[in-house]
Regions:
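Glycine-rich beta-strand-turn "strand-cap" elements at beta-sheet edges
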Residues: 2, 37-49, 72-94
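Generic structural motif
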Residues: 11-13, 57, 92
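An amphipathic, aromatic/His-enriched active-site/gating alpha helix that lines ligand/cofactor pockets
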Residues: 18-33, 53-86
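Short, surface-exposed ligand-recognition loops at beta-strand->loop->(often short) alpha-helix junctions
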Residues: 9-19
Length: 94
């Protein structure tokens, strides 16, 4: 299992949250996607952290990033980016 973590700084937090909820199924319907969770900053309410569990980095890259679902996802949420998101993949230590 791989955890994708993406940090979004946005211009309109409420509009971004609504756009995310409308586009969330683009992620969930991807082969290899196990779970999706979006959190919103308390101290920085225009910052969001997305956590997606994937079977592998390849599942993320091949089954989502390289598809029309990714294009639809970015079309929905991209207009609210204050800057490009920061995205990394992580694995468990234990």
């Amino acid at each position: 299992m791989v955890l994708e973590v993406a940090i979004f700084d946005v211009t309109d937090a409420d509009a971004f949250a609504a756009a995310y909820l409308g586009a969330r199924d683009q992620l969930l319907s991807s082969d290899g996607c196990r779970s999706v969770r979006m959190t919103r900053g308390i101290e920085t309410p225009k910052r969001f952290v997305l956590m997606v569990e994937w079977d592998s980095v390849q599942a993320h890259e091949n089954n989502f990033r390289g598809t029309e679902r990714f294009k639809a996802w970015r079309t929905a949420i991209g207009p609210f980016f204050a800057e490009p998101p920061r995205v990394e993949h992580f694995t468990d230590v234990d």
